[in-house]
Amino acid sequence: MSFTAYSDPCWPWSRGRPIARSARRHVAWVAGYLCVSRFGHDRCICRRGSFWPETRVQRVAGLQWSQLLLPVKCLNFWLYTLCYAAGMGSFFVFFSIAPGLMMGRPRCVSAWLQPAVRHSAIAMVFTARFMGSVIPKWGSPSVLRMGMGCLIAGAVLLAITEIWALHRVRLYCSNVASGIGVATAVSVPMALFEDSTMLLERSRQSTSAWACTARKHRNVDHFAVAAQRLGPCRVTVWTLATVVLGLSCVSRVKGSRGQGEHDAGRATNVGKYIKSQSLRECGKLSPNKCCSRPKTYAFRLG
């Protein structure tokens, strides 16, 4: 074998050198980005735990480790956390995994995929638009059960269409139901910040704990991964929806009691405000001593 064979551009080894060089560059860049992102992620977790008011509890005595377990002991924490996990899991599966699976099938074309995504997006937009008036009127547990019911209904319709190949039903029914369920599952936990002052501090602790434990490079939540490892629960999103629906029914009595106490407290605040305004108009109360306007707990989307 002559020396010209190694210098020939048609030789396989000479062709493989640029590929190996580009592969090394790609691996180096990826490793650099991973190191930087990991450092930033750890730094953000440290700052969240040290400086944010949600995790920095105003205390006089020393830190008690039992305070860190307060969100875990609360049933509402698990209820709304699983609700949010089911909603975000459905969102990522529908918009990231479903298009690739549908385009890989011979009977599915791109003309069917576009209306499917379009109808689901429209359903999510309209549902999120009216959540601000629906949640204060019906209550968070009722809206939560409705959203989980929509997710389960979408799963049943998808199973029916897979068996009988009813593509039009899948486009116009299951996607709309899934979109409504996703928007509801994401909106209801966020409404806790404005729905009740009794749950405000607990919601902040739960959100901070969830943000500190979540991984930004994972699209699937830890609960979905844990449920998938159980074996029979292959479709984890609908399993989470069923669990949330059951938990919401269990906490129905407790939620109704808390809502009654909250309504009584809110009525008392409104009564004090009206009384102070009437005294101010009569000149019997100075403006500085007038009670402030009571807080309204209606949830509004940006």
From Swiss-Prot:
GO terms for cellular component: plasma membrane. GO terms for biological process: response to antibiotic. Keywords: Antibiotic resistance, Cell membrane, Membrane, Plasmid. It is found in: Cell membrane. It comes from the Bacteria. InterPro entries: MFS_trans_sf. This protein is thought to be a membrane-associated barrier of drug uptake. This is Chloramphenicol resistance protein. The gene is cml.
